[in-house]
Amino acid sequence: MEIFQKAKAVRLRSHHDKYLVADEDEESVTQERNGSAGAAKWTVEIIPGSTNLIRLKSAYGKYLTASNKPFLLGATGKKVLQTNPSRLDSSLAWEPIRDSALVKLKTRYGNFLRGNGGLPPWRNSVTHDIPHRSATQEWVLWHVDVVEILSANANSDHHHQHLQLQQPPSPLHHSDSLDFTPGSPSRSDRFFRQE
């Protein structure tokens, strides 16, 4: 989805007008009204080889993860956590699906990121689930606020890095950092040095 393709960082606001927040315990994910907190900012990573899958990284450097752990015994919703797995697997992948001006984030299980409401323990909780009742259909809809935009250079650098990975590395040329003519400016594509 194009909004995530151009975003470096986003905030997600639920139907309850609360932001998806990474808790200080560096494991839990909840909803809060304060969207200006750093913990409400999620860095966007486009999954290599995919045009429609993303990973979201918290302010604590952990990924938004669709776990297999039940939120409550007997309930269908599963916990959404912050994790830092040794291997980046599909539990970290989210597929953004546009729904008018809003977005649904779909897991590999076919569930959707859901900001829950109601009485505790549901209030402010975040799960992934399929909404079965019409009353909770909107709970899977999120407003996306772009906090940081990728620069054009970042996009071309990312594209350039991707191309470099597909090509064999070129041989390294020996160059001394002092290879210049004294008293004259030295110029390269990226740097300018003058004595």
Task: Locate the predicted segments by residue.
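Lectin-like carbohydrate-binding module/patch detector with strong preference for beta-trefoil
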Residues: 1-195
